[in-house]
Amino acid sequence: MRVGTSSNSLMWILRASWVALLLASPWHVAAHHSTPVNVVLIVGGWAMGASGLLSSIALTPIGLTVVRLVTVPMVALVTSQVSYGITENNATVAMTLALVAIACAAALACTTRVSTAMVQAGAYGDETRYPLRTPFPYVLPAALVQLGYTAAIISGPLLLAARSYAAGVAVTLIAVAASFKVPRRLHQLSRRWLVVVPAGLVVHDHLVLAETFMVRHANLTDVRTADGPGEEADLTGGVFGRRLVVSLTAADKVVLAPITRQVLGTTDALHVSSFSTAPRQLDAAMARLKK
């Protein structure tokens, strides 16, 4: 599937937002502390801004995770320096540009079209990927984890630069330890999609499933939408509202992830004759499956 014109336009706006942020360089405005703190702010600002821009150019699912990871600390950096940049440093234009740019980048990073464009860019051959909605039970924990990780990543080096060595070392060690797990865990949210291929469909969701679940076209009897959970196996992970319900000619085996088994109180594998999943572009996915 080719990325649509509207998605391409949004991607260009996202790239332009990162370019504008780099041009505004609000981390230079923020650098009004001691020299070590200034160095941390400037190096960190350029590194995060460049990462956001490069990830929006080289479209990949990993890039989607990177954009989401760097957007949060950039929002914190820009908003925390608005007052000083405008009143003390007389940098009204730069700070206004930075605010608008990071607001656009943050908003676009959350949109379905940007997510789809970045996920689809990594597709193989004649396959169409539809990102899945984030299960409700994971939304708040994921947000809290990202906020905590962001706070540790930012405050650790700044505390060290400000010579608060005890607190700085402790927070930096926490940030380093978290870096081995948090990005990988958050990346799972970017690697959840329904794939439509000529041979059938694939549910690629290692947050909910232990193994990728593939259904061949010959085993598909019906595809429909539903407003909520029904008698079918719920493979959405706990999404509210509309979902795609797929009915099979013969029951097929689906292997659940450990956390899904605990939530459902069932065995590690189920034989399902119908199941539901929740792609963000629900109607588009159904139309593609019915072709």
Please tell me what each predicted stretch does.
Residues L41-M48, A94-A103, G168-A177:
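Hydrophobic core segments of alpha-helical transmembrane domains in multi-pass membrane proteins
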Residues E231-L256:
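Short, surface-exposed polybasic-and-hydrophobic patches located at secondary-structure transitions
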Residues M1-A91:
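Membrane-anchoring hydrophobic segments
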Residues L201-V203, T212-G230:
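Phosphoinositide-dependent membrane-docking surfaces
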Residues A121-V195:
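Anionic N-terminal interaction surfaces
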